[in-house]
């Protein structure tokens, strides 16, 4: 690649994947498989979209020398985001929720082991994400702010609230405003948090950029949710890597709008996201470049 800035970002994404794959938590226990099961779903792959958003901000805002000095600490935070996201997927796949048998081209944990193990591993990954942040060697004020952002957006005011609404209203059609609220919380808030955490971890205090990243992340997250709803009805398990056609009685954008209108809505959101990103370029060209490259790669996989 001829672009040195993008090369730096892409290389860090690859190094993070290596960091993740070599990360191992040893449990002092005589449980026959809990240690293996703990990190299994994390290691089973995935796009690493949320950690890559976090790294996109850091690689753009922190000088390479300063970044290199803190690389391991940044990777701990990126891993914390991935752990919290993975816990949410494990619980979302449970029989009491989506009852999915496949995730990331592998059997879900409750399908491979049992429901109890899946619940406990989800609980463990949730709490481990905050252990990773608290054990970081970043400044104390940064650690506190990172914990605040992740807990607020991944907890009862964010992802958990969205999941609760999704489950409770499974057989009750919602209107567009309600559906948007649901998915802003269930999906978009953690995406938004990943961007905000990147800014906070950089040590740069920029309230205007913080608010922009928050709003941009919410819109981007909504766009990806609409695209995901479309995938559920248009792709099979082999194409998507997860159990599909589960949204028959759920509140999805396809069920509310129909496939054609949902596809148009996704295209509108995608255009708005890319246009918003272009407006960022004059003030933060490296950040715009990193995010644009990541989004274009991911959009290709969803459209």
Residue ranges and their predicted role:
Residues 1-303:
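All-alpha prenyltransferase/terpene-synthase fold signal
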